[in-house]
Amino acid sequence: MRQRFDYPIFSDREIATRHQAVYQLMEQENVDALLIYGAGRYASDVYWLSDWPSSREAYVLFQTGKEPVILLQLFNHFPMAKVMSVIKDVRWAGANTTSSVLDLIRERGLDSKKIGIVGSLPYQVYLRIAEKFPGAALSDLSGKLRMMRTIRSPEEIDRIRFASKLTDESIQALAGGLKAGMREDEIAALIEPAYLKRGGYAGIHFMSSMPMREPDFPVPSQFHSNRKLQKGDALITEISGAYSGYSGQIHRTFSIGEGPTAEWKKMHDAAMEAFEVLSKVIKDGATTTEAEEAAEVIHRRGYSTY
């Protein structure tokens, strides 16, 4: 029988700390409930609160003095949520999700209360709530919840470190397997085994190939072509290996069949200089302005940022 402990989980203490932070936010903002929405890979708020990596649309309702509730789609995703979620009241949202949300608000006696909203709630749902419950006061607390989440816990940092290790291993596999004649769209087969063998998955693997002497695309592309790598090409990459809701990221440029041209080498040296300067500046207490000022080395070397 499947159980929660068969999957990567956060400790009970970690989850309790998160839930307590939500209730403190509700008290601070003077709301009676918090309705959190997420869908697919854009459901990190739901994941953070439930320890279940939501797969389709889902709503989580927190309410002072009552246990939280999850409404989710689809019906065949319901059994997995029941196993993994630390929130025990998990419900299928039925044939009409919006109607189920309205029913939950009514069931919980929130039809004339203050409800905070987190996430990009579909306009149709927001409109129905506002029309059905004109006495309810809705306010957007997305930014405040996410600002609270920006300070990572030790358990979260452990996951980020492991995801970053998977990312490093994938880039090493890429370096060892690239060769002229490969298609762009088959390169992912070099990358993903590093994640999959360790219980991870691909966050992103954006890539663009082009002749070094005639570059024609400014960024790693989100969709891969069937173009074949050739001697004298550059392959620019943006790779993220992920593990249970957290990912690393690495950018690397590869030259195919020969070393980098003088211009590519010069550009790489400028990027390395910027990285080394930034790595010294970015620390506890640093501001984004300070980081941007440190990155000005790119402009001083004659380049622009895209």
List each language-model region with its residue ranges:
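Active-site neighborhoods and metal-handling regions in enzymes and metal-associated proteins
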Residues: M1-Y306
